[in-house]
Swiss-Prot record:
Protein name: Translation factor guf1, mitochondrial
Pfam families the record matches: EFG_C (PF00679), GTP_EFTU (PF00009), LepA_C (PF06421)
Protein location: Mitochondrion inner membrane
Domain tr-type G: start-end pairs: 66-246
GN (gene name): guf1
Protein's UniProt keywords contain Transit peptide: yes
Biological process annotations from GO: positive regulation of translation; translation
UniProt GO MF annotations: GTP binding; GTPase activity; mitochondrial ribosome binding
EC number(s) from the headed UniProt entry: 3.6.5.-
Record keyword Signal present: no
Membrane topology summary: Peripheral membrane protein
Length: 664
């Protein structure tokens, strides 16, 4: 009774609101229960949708699509893309000038390494000749391993700033990224950066651009992104040279999913480009790829962080998330087209993106087997943000359950490993990178093998296999002419075949070599930098599959194979690696009561061997020095005992031994 009276007091003391005020939801409370699974979600949606229109939104809504400009910055690694992005954001008032450093490099690993890994986007408003322009900037990665990020970014853009370092000139990835942009039909604006450096040679860089790309460099802009010199000249050039996107707000919604990432509160957030129509919170959309339907919880722009808006229109790039969110991260398919429910027949889906192929594979295992599920969740969340990674579950007798991961290159793999450790606190064991091989059977069937576990044994190779092929790449190397001899020597030592050699200035060389991908992932870039004192740059593209003498090298401990360590490789690498393996593994295996034999073998042929000596009990301690027959008898007995122990004893190898052995 006392509880009922207390409840009545609370209810009577509650503020009284009119019933009418509850019906002012933007899309009608009668239908709200269809959109959201619970009352908390309904309340969240009303709060999102009923935000007052801001001054920023009023300015954006007044800009017609003819005054939109979508552009990106194309350059080699470390030529100043992210720094230039900062200056442009400051110039347009998007961020405050001063202490900003690589605002669009949002990952810890990007700030640590000083490279861009993920293409990041930002919307800016720029006033030119008294009129507002809506500029959409994409800061793209420069490294070859993130080519898929670059090509996806170009789908959102109408033009690009082709940025070249005044002191280094045109580099390998400048060439590669130029051809990607050129193939997409982007309008290119030449920009020379770092003109304030004492070693800067702007005219040489301009001549290289003119000779290599056949670009008109008369209107090239000379800037210093670090000091801000001449950066203000870039934006009028962007407005004048880059075309506006094509789109119609009155047509049915046609929206391309460009990227996605995971937020612990909002779930899957999607970066989208609107080609036609417009999108508001509360509307229902459908995916062409999966057929699944979603209610939009929030729409907005990156300014430079997520900034909610009431609507995003044709020509804009923005973010959305659904409420309720996507049930599985795999539902967000990059390159998918969305439209409003009911408009499916009126809308033609967009072509989407070419799926990048993983070319470098590693196995990943949790240090503690109990953390397998945590590792699986962490990998799935990162794959949501990077769809070029392939994931397959794998099991090892030595290391337990794990994953076989495929990457675009070794830097891609290294960055993913760093992100797993930093963003998710995952403790993992990673095996050395390997490349896929193609097995052609005698009956004509072809099979791509990415894991040593699936590689055929010796008998199958002899009797059932016609040929084994390995992937080759066409590598483009640029470097000063004085290192030509050393670079050719390095390429030849790595089974390379020279294709072209040309000088694009009196002192700079472009050398093209066809190289096995397996040699490229074996620290080829590090060796190249060492041979040229850091002056060389490298880019590569897929070439073809070529036949090779491919074998599987295994590590045996007391004749038992250690599956986690096996590698597929060319026979020319076997001797060197086999000796390295047995020497290194011996250092991490504890002594036992019996002899431990460590061998590296190809099939039945042992290539290298090391032995871990056993502990030895002094059985002669109590004997008199002259008792020779007794001495012999005790030693024979000890020898027999060891033989029996070796026959039945299993070598116990600690987890930390594998961790130390596989560590770089």
């Amino acid at each position: 009774m006392r509880g009922c009276l207390q409840l009545a007091r609370w209810l009577s003391a509650a503020p009284k609101g009119t019933a009418a005020s509850l019906t002012r939801a933007p899309f009608g409370l009668a239908n709200a229960t269809r959109f959201f699974t619970n009352s908390a979600a309904r309340a969240g949606s009303r709060a999102t949708a009923s935000k007052p229109v801001t001054d920023l939104e009023n300015r954006i809504s007044a800009i017609p699509i003819e005054r939109y400009r979508n552009f990106c910055i194309v350059a080699h690694v470390d030529h100043g893309k992210s720094t230039l992005s900062d200056r442009l954001l400051e110039l347009t008032g998007t961020i405050q000038p001063g202490s900003n450093k690589q605002v669009l490099d949002k990952l810890d690993v990007e700030r640590e390494r000083g490279i861009t890994v993920k293409a990041q986007t930002c919307t800016m408003i720029y006033n030119h000749n008294g009129e507002d322009y809506l500029l959409h900037l994409v800061d793209t990665p420069g490294h070859v391993d993130f080519r898929a990020e670059v090509s996806r970014s170009y789908a959102s853009c109408g033009g690009a700033l082709l940025l070249v370092d005044a002191s280094q000139g045109v580099q390998a990835q400048t060439v590669a990224n130029f051809y990607l942009a050129f193939a997409q039909g982007l309008e290119l604006i030449p920009v020379i950066n770092k003109v304030d450096l004492p070693s800067a040679e702007p005219q040489r860089a301009l001549d290289q651009m003119k000779h290599t790309f056949e670009l008109d460099t008369e209107n090239a802009v000379m800037v210093s992104a670090k000091t801000g010199l001449n950066v203000e000249q870039l934006l009028p050039t962007v407005v004048d040279k880059i075309p506006a996107p094509i789109g119609d707000c009155k047509k049915p919604l046609r929206m391309l999913l460009v990227d996605s990432w995971y937020d612990s509160y909002k779930g899957v957030i999607c970066l989208v480009r609107i080609f036609d129509g417009e999108l508001r919170a509360g509307q229902q959309v459908v995916s062409f790829a999966t057929g699944l339907k979603y209610y939009v919880g929030e729409v907005g722009i990156m300014y430079p962080n997520e900034t909610a808006q009431s609507v995003i229109r044709a020509g804009q790039v923005g973010y959305i998330y659904f409420n309720p969110g996507m049930k599985r991260s795999q539902e967000a398919k990059i390159g998918d087209t969305f439209t409003k429910v009911g408009s499916e027949k009126a809308v033609q889906p967009l072509p989407g993106f070419e799926e990048p192929k993983a070319m470098v594979f590693v196995a990943a295992y949790p240090v503690d087997a109990d953390h397998f599920e945590h590792l699986e969740d962490s990998i799935n969340q990162l794959v949501l943000n990077d769809r070029s990674i392939t994931v397959q579950k794998e099991s090892s007798e030595a290391l337990g359950a794990g994953f076989r991961l495929g990457f675009l290159g070794t830097l891609h793999c290294s960055v993913f490993e760093d992100r797993l450790r930093q963003e998710h606190g995952a403790s993992i064991i990673i095996t050395p990178p390997s490349v896929p091989v193609k097995v052609i059977w005698t009956d004509g069937k072809e099979e791509i093998i990415t894991s040593p576990v699936r590689f055929p044994d010796d008998e199958e190779v002899r009797n059932k296999i016609a040929e084994i092929q390995e992937p080759y790449v066409l590598a483009t190397l640029t470097f000063p002419e004085e290192y030509l001899g050393k670079v050719i020597e390095l390429c030849e030592a790595n089974r390379g075949e020279q294709k072209t050699l040309e000088y694009f200035t009196a002192t700079q060389v472009i050398l093209k070599y066809e190289l096995p991908l397996a040699q490229l992932v074996d620290d080829f870039f590090g060796k190249l930098k060492g041979s040229t004192k850091g002056y060389a740059s490298l880019d590569y593209e897929e070439s073809a599959w070529q036949p090779g003498h491919i074998v599987k090298l295994q590590l045996l401990v007391n004749k038992a194979p250690v599956d986690a360590v096996a590698r597929i490789m060319h026979s020319s690498q076997v001797d060197r690696l086999a000796r390295q393996w047995v020497t290194k593994f011996k250092q991490h295996v504890d002594r036992q009561l019996f002899e431990v034999v460590i061998q590296a073998a190809v099939g039945r042929k042992v290539i290298a061997r090391e032995t871990v000596k056993p502990y030895r009990k002094d059985v002669l301690a109590k004997l008199h020095a002259s008792d020779v027959s007794r001495r012999r008898k005790l030693l024979e007995k000890q020898k027999e005992g060891r033989k029996r122990l070796r026959a039945v004893g299993n070598v116990v190898i600690e987890h930390k031994a594998f961790q130390a052995f596989l560590a770089k």
